[in-house]
Amino acid sequence: MERNTGWKRIVYLMCAIQVGAGIAMIGVMAFLPLFLGEIGVTAAGEAAFWAGLISGVTPFMIALSAPFWSIQADRRGPKLVMSIVLAAVTLIAFLCAVSTSPWQVFIFRLLQGLVGGFVPIGLSVIASVSPEEETSRTLGYFQAAMVSGIMFGPLVGGLVADTLGYRMPFVFCGVLSLICLICLRLFMPEIHRKGASGEKSSTWQELKYFAAISRVRLMVGIQFLCNFGITGIGPILPLYIKDMLGGGSEIIATIVGIIIFLAGGASALCSLSTGAVTARVSLPRLLTAATVFVGLTFIMQYMMTNVWGLGFFRAVTGIGMGFIMPVANTLIAQAVPNEKRSIV
């Protein structure tokens, strides 16, 4: 993409929109298993099954559809494609608010995943407009914005759910996503990659190209495993905490939101400091240390027998995750030609 002289403005705008979009997309995590009880899923085992299915289908479909949308963003411009994503998130949030069965919620979340891919497109925009020497720092900013959405989403969603009922967070998330869409349309400039109108490769050809790069394969694998570990407990976390508390608390969604908030806050702070740390420590060494650290904190989470011990070590895990993602993304960006960064 063209190196715009106003690249800082684009970076800050993308980060701000990512925070809002992240809250809108992740805000349901703190109360989703509890909401299922309101639409007829009463058994704990059945609620856990549906929570895992509904929570997992969206990122799964995003993983399948993201390469297609990234290539479309490269050809047609990221502004148009991100607008489609935000419009879909807005509509689906409102549809979930009036859903009456777990199957309806499942289908809506599946459709959201099909038009997903906001984060990789945002990453490609940041990597493309940032000067080479600023890439690590700006990707750290975007990672912090992404984590902030993950951090505030469940907290806000949990608070709204515990005070206004389990349907109102969907409405809140829909309105917030609509605001992000309006800001994107008003303030985001059109960005086109030089030569984008030339020879075009298919999605499969692009995937084969990146899969042939060993560093890209390694970094994608590390990101997948770390995200799998940190989010694997997400769908059942409210039920797990409810069991820890003996089912006696009326603010379970808020407690879940606080725990996720603490983990996200630690991750965001570390992401913001990535640029300063990588100026003193090599990227591979920092990535190795962070992954080992995260592995140890996962073991400590398993050993906890109370809610706040679990919350503490999930927050500590966020420290390592805050370094892993921007460092891995920087290494990926360095491994591909500049003209390919808008796709990878």
Positions of predicted regions on the chain:
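Paired small-residue
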Residues: W103-L111, W308-V316
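Cytoplasmic helix-loop-helix junction between adjacent transmembrane helices
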Residues: F108-M146
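Structural signature of the two symmetry-related core transmembrane helices
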Residues: L80-L95, G174, R285-I299
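Juxtamembrane intracellular "pre-TM" segments in multi-pass secondary transporters
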Residues: M1-K8, E190-G221
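Short amphipathic helix-loop junctions that connect adjacent transmembrane helices
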Residues: F31-A48, I236-T254
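Conserved MFS/SLC helix-loop-helix module at the cytosolic interface between two early adjacent transmembrane helices
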Residues: L64-T100, T278
